[in-house]
Amino acid sequence: ELTKGKAGFEIYDGFKPQPGEKIFTKTVNSCFKESGLLEYLREKQAKEVVIAGLMTDYCIDATVKCGFEHGFSIIVPKHANTTTDNEYMTGKQTYEYYNGFIWQGRYAHCISPEETIERMKR
């Protein structure tokens, strides 16, 4: 379950925030709505945002499109989002549909993790 306080909400150990890093909690599909993240990114004059997580066809899609609408260059590392099967497509098909068709070249740069890391070093 993806609810604060539940096991499914916990941050993977390899991605846990470092001391002093800011944490934003979202309560709706896009992380930009009423979380303070948008204001923080604007204050920091961020130009590029890397997006990863669950669920491809809900929260990730909303965040990618909202980030794009707010003027950010959006990076979605390959295999850094996932979802479940629905009544129309398998999770894999949904992933491929969004990452390979809907976002790529329109709203985001869907690139390899290695390329993402290189861009983050700039």
PLM regions: where:
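Active-site-adjacent betaalpha module
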Residues: 2-122
